[in-house]
């Protein structure tokens, strides 16, 4: 929820040294990082060192479903014991076709990944210019820190009711008490004007709620 990334090269080196298994959750990275959208592990050159990797088709790819990769022994074990796999039906052929088309399209559009990072970085800079407390990180996640659950929900409601901006409040137990925040993830299609409108709305909401910035 902070938008941080792990030190994958160092972790993989330790795993290799001590014969440990590496498991990586790439649901927030697949499609968005790496030259072809393969994820953060690919971007930092560690993809072939990950033993088990899971991702989703429901975020960057905009469809439904998910996946787990690994060697044949691992995958056979998962198929045998994972209740989430055993007690569900297979994905619709229509969804599979849509997912395949989306993966192919995202793979060929690194320009959107570059633009995505530019817009996220730009939003962080704009927020800092008006003293809105944004958590520093080097990813596309933009956490605006509030620090109070009731206030976080109130501010989220105000953004929607008064400015037509939907933002999900992130409260305990998703994050620790005292670190509640509004969480934004701008896309490549969010224009500079849209980012400006968001920042201005947040500035007004923070002021109306008498939150110190």
Model-found features: residue ranges?
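Active-site C-terminal subdomain of aminotransferase-like
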Residues: 18-24, 28, 33-138, 151
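Active-site core of PLP-dependent enzymes with the aminotransferase class I/II
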Residues: 1-19, 151-152, 193-194
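Thr-Gly-centered strand-to-loop micro-motif
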Residues: 55-56, 63-65, 89, 144, ...
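Conserved PLP-binding catalytic core of the aspartate aminotransferase-like
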Residues: 2, 6, 114-123, 128-164, ...
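Alpha-helical structural signal in soluble globular domains
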Residues: 7-17, 43, 49, 122, ...
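PLP-dependent enzyme catalytic core of the Aspartate aminotransferase-like
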Residues: 161-162, 174-213
């Amino acid at each position: 929820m902070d938008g941080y990334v792990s030190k994958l090269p160092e972790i993989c080196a330790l795993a290799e040294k001590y014969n440990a298994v590496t498991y990586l959750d790439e649901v927030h990275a697949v499609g968005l990082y790496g030259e072809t959208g393969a994820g953060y592990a690919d971007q930092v050159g560690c993809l072939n060192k990950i033993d088990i990797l899971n991702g989703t088709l429901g975020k960057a790819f905009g469809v439904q479903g998910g996946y787990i990769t690994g060697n044949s022994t691992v995958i056979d074990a998962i198929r045998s014991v994972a209740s989430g796999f055993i007690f569900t039906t297979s994905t619709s052929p229509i969804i599979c076709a849509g997912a395949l088309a989306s993966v192919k399209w995202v793979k060929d559009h690194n320009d959107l990944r570059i633009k995505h990072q530019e817009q996220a970085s730009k939003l962080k800079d704009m927020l800092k210019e008006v003293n809105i407390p944004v958590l520093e990180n080097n990813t596309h996640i933009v956490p605006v820190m509030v620090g109070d659950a009731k206030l976080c929900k109130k501010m989220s409601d105000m953004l929607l009711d008064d400015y037509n901006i939907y933002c999900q409040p992130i409260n305990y137990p998703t994050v620790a008490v005292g670190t509640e925040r509004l969480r934004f993830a701008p896309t490549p299609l969010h224009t500079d004007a849209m980012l400006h409108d968001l920042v201005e709305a947040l500035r007004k909401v923070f002021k109306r709620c008498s939150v110190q910035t």
